[in-house]
Amino acid sequence: MSALQAVVTLLLCGQLLAVETGSEAAAGSCPKAPEIANGHVEYSVRYQCDKYYKLRAGNGVYTFNNKQWINKDIGLQLPECEEDVSCPEPPKIKNGYVEYSVRYQCKTYYKLRTCGDGVYTFNSKKQWINKNVGQQLPECEAVCGKPKHPVDQTQRIIGGSLDAKGSLPWQAKMVSHHNLISGATLINERWLLTTAKNLYLGHTSDKKAKDITPTLRLYVGKNQLVEVEKVVLHPDHSKVDIGLIKLREKVPVNDKVMPICLPSKDYVAVDRVGYVSGWGRNENFNFTGHLKYVMLPVADQDKCVKHYEGNNAPKNKTATSPVGVQPILNENTFCVGLSKYQEDTCYGDAGSAFVVHDQEDDTWYAAGILSFDKSCAVAEYGVYVKVTSILDWVRKTIANN
């Protein structure tokens, strides 16, 4: 019977009598049980596994019924023995004792949130204790800014490169009222950043956030539709073009879906390069349906302001915006120029992140969120909301919601 041996048992009015017969067992090999008043005899066998093996399913007891051996859990199916990987009792030592411990580990693309190491020891009070956090159980949170296939930084969304490998897994696509497409950026398993203008696409300015929410469709990864629970607009969104989107459920993090890290320092410096992705219009002003990305440099802010002279420029500026639309330019924004191939972002890319790679910790961070996506290689600069300027509001909003 391989790892199985059988035990013949007689069930007598609820009392179990067993006769071990080694590897063979049959009801006929036992002496006939005496009859009793108001009761009857049932014959059964119990399969047991060899040492270091255990039953995969069922309790191993089979009753003979209608000329068939039946198990109450798995019916006519014979039991199987599998290797028992549970720990045996360790040997004792003189002048010492055994201490049991376990280690909690997170799945791929997740990490321990708590400061402990995940190791818990079973103490004399029958409690599992971690030396750092006591009885508090560890929590696993999503890894951010660590794509499995990062962008090839030697390559160079007007033009741009196709993101076929999921190199920017924080990029989401938002479809608003009247099927207007824009971008959003995943910052944890349940929250995304986008622009306030994106949230108002197809709506009048008097619309409330709760009325906007049901009109949004949001896609992450390979066109995975996720349900929006609510949107939160920045309290000063006319000057800080930002909003937050909360999902109804956490998204599973994998090689196609991963949040971008929020920065702990300012990565905005002139000529520093970063990457922007999106589903915006291409050089023919058509929506391609393919996620593309482009490498762009941070630009000089004074030159950018001069380029877009108008309502937001100093009083001595007189020229008008080259694209006929005035971007928001203030202490909360920064400008990004064209690539050396004259590539740029365009309509539909707003809400996407300007991400930079920190070589010290090999992690990608969101330095900015694209606000002004109408340059389309006609103007020289795109305009981004600086993420460090909104960090306090983002963290407070998430904590309160």
Curated annotation (Swiss-Prot):
* Disulfide pattern: 49-81, 106-140, 144-261, 304-335, 346-376
Question: Where do glycans attach?
Answer: 286, 316
The chain positions of domain Sushi read 28-83, 85-142
What tissues is it present in?
A: Expressed by the liver and secreted in plasma.
InterPro entries recorded:
Peptidase_S1_PA, Peptidase_S1_PA_chymotrypsin, Peptidase_S1A, Sushi/SCR/CCP_sf, Sushi_SCR_CCP_dom, Trypsin_dom
The answer on whether this UniProt entry bears the keyword Glycoprotein reads yes
Matching PROSITE patterns, A to Z? SUSHI, TRYPSIN_DOM
Name of this protein: Haptoglobin
- What is the species listed in this Swiss-Prot or TrEMBL entry? Capra ibex (Ibex)
